């Protein structure tokens, strides 16, 4: 099972560090990253959160959660999501959300265990087509 909200389901260790270095420049708003490292200091998981105020109160998006395949099922994702929820509470976030595919059952369980609820929102996607 893959527990992640990411376009990068199988990042190599060196790619994780490079990916994390680009996070602060990706979205406008305040970017917060929690990382979990193993005993030798390699990143084994991370959670990227974007905080922003669209004029109706501070909102928080869990933009990406990643746990390396060999560390999945060991509580790393739960620890990261607990930190995300703690940050939302500390910062008095009025709305927190995360996006995932419905068929990513492990991610859905992870997010629900952290207190997120399925709001049945329909998201429509547009992709350019060749003309």
Predicted regions and their residues:
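Terminal substrate-recognition subdomain of acyl/acetyltransferases
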Residues: 113, 117, 122-131
